[in-house]
Design a protein with these regions (language model features):
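Conserved donor-nucleotide/metal-binding helix-loop-beta segment in metal-dependent transferases, i.e.
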Residues: 8-34
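Active-site acidic Asp-centered loop
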Residues: 4-5
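Catalytic core and acceptor-binding pocket of nucleotide-sugar-dependent glycosyltransferases
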Residues: 34-120
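Short aromatic/hydrophobic "clamp" motif used to bind/position activated sugar donors
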Residues: 1
């Protein structure tokens, strides 16, 4: 399933290249190994499995669902991408040209319109 929040955007074709992953989203710079879910692709069967078998008890520092899912999925050995692959899919805190999409870049990049104009 594709999660596409209001502050997300697609910049070019290619989203189908990332369907192999159980979860992929933009890399979260200050939380190693975690991905943001604002623009993400998730395996719904695995999301359901995690919710039904692993009760959510909150996280010590970050309690958002994307942090919970990516931490739990890494712990359980699901198929998750590395940072370079995440950046090819979507960017957020660290902008890299060539990404298929973005999430919430206006929060982290003052001149985000200039970055997006590079795709026109």
């Amino acid at each position: 399933v594709l999660i596409f929040q209001h502050d997300s955007g697609l910049l070019k074709d290619g989203i189908e290249e990332f369907l192999e992953w159980d979860f992929i989203g933009s890399w979260i710079k200050n939380i190693p190994g975690c991905m943001n879910g604002g623009l993400s692709i998730r395996n719904p069967k695995l999301m359901y499995e995690i919710c039904s078998k692993h009760r959510y008890k909150g996280m010590a520092v970050h309690g958002n669902e994307d942090i919970y899912f990516t931490n739990k999925m890494r712990e359980l050995g699901y198929k998750l991408p590395d940072k370079a692959t995440c950046n090819k899919f979507a960017v957020e805190t660290e902008f890299e040209y060539g990404s298929v999409g973005y999430h919430a870049i206006d929060k982290y990049h003052k001149n985000y319109n200039l970055l997006l104009n590079q795709y026109d």
